[in-house]
Amino acid sequence: IIKSYSQAEFFTKLPEIEEEIKVVTYVAAEGDISTDLLSPGNQAHSRSDRELHGKCMISEDAQLEIRKLQKENPDKRVMIVSEKGTMGVGSSRMSGVNNVALWTGIQASPYVPFVNIAPIVAGTNGISPIFLTTVGVTGGIGVDLKNWTKKLDSNGDPIINNDDNPILEQRYSVDTGTILTINTKKQKLYDETGDKELVDMSSSFSPQKLEFMKAGGSYAIVFGKKLQSFACKALNIE
């Protein structure tokens, strides 16, 4: 075991991440989604109980709809979407990511109940940076959809409505139930068929983020390297 850790086999022996991930969308809200929607502050007392705290994510109706999407699309992952907004504003809130993973992620271990990893979240305006860091802790994927853009006039300036807000044009739909394809090799988001490119995702798949996804989260990398250093020291390997 020590020799294996000294050779970093805790990481090198892991399978590569899937080249193609099919997702089905669930629009949790229109506009920015606060982490308080995912893990309400008034339910903080239950955060140590993953199963119990998971029941407060968004709403009971939302949870039923997510389960329905999973039942109808057993070969696809549910992607939580902030339509016309940014996902995860407010705080990093690990419990919020844990809740999203609990409902839509992958089971971390068959021996540890209610601990899931690798959720997929998305926002028209991307993911809040501090929340995106927490998504990386679980080996998840954050998608900057860019599915709405500002409508421009002939001079290239945004067209403003009567409320002094820019008029938006939809580039493609992510309405609840929409099936999309994430290609991790090409680092792009495609339509259901995988033929039509919708948006570039290279920022979601930096070398470091790919490591986190392969390992099942950043903690696996951090503590794996600590164990590797210990193993090398024990075996007098530099």
Walk through the language-model features, giving the residues of each.
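Fe-S-dependent hydro-lyases/dehydratases of central metabolism
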Residues: 1-238
